[in-house]
């Protein structure tokens, strides 16, 4: 098997910009490993495709609001994406900006509409490879993320950057079994499970 076996063209107009009304209404492609036959189902059909004793492994990390909008002291806009929380007050991040902020400078994180509401000053301590190391003030990285951050949707999901994130996006980009905070991206295969489907699968065990 070669990695190239999985290469395919995906037209942009076929990429769903919003989820199905019901999580389990998403489409499911099934490949029979013995015959090579491909069949198409809906995710709600999953229980009919698994057997007693099959092992299913779930990633129960919870996506944090890891994307911030902000600006440099000069006024230039930037976007910050948390990559790794080092401790309560320090984090490694990606910064998207026309010009990178300098080590020792301060950036302001705030609302995406640029109105300057609830802005928080964050210190740029320096570079760490491809990332920047930031120091956050009290109450710390995760608390500030909850106050000012957004759930980082994938780049192929188009949203107006000037509009605050909807509560629907924030809820649907979490699995129903998410518990442990820390992920900056959802384990997307798990987004199609709902509580009813999980209960049905548990009964088959």
Spell out what each predicted region is.
Residues 26-31, 107:
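Short polybasic amphipathic segments
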Residues 25-26, 205:
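Class I SAM-dependent methyltransferase SAM-binding "motif I" and its flanking Rossmann-like core
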Residues 1-20, 35, 40-44, 55, ...:
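Internal, non-catalytic "lid/hinge" segments that mediate substrate recognition, gating
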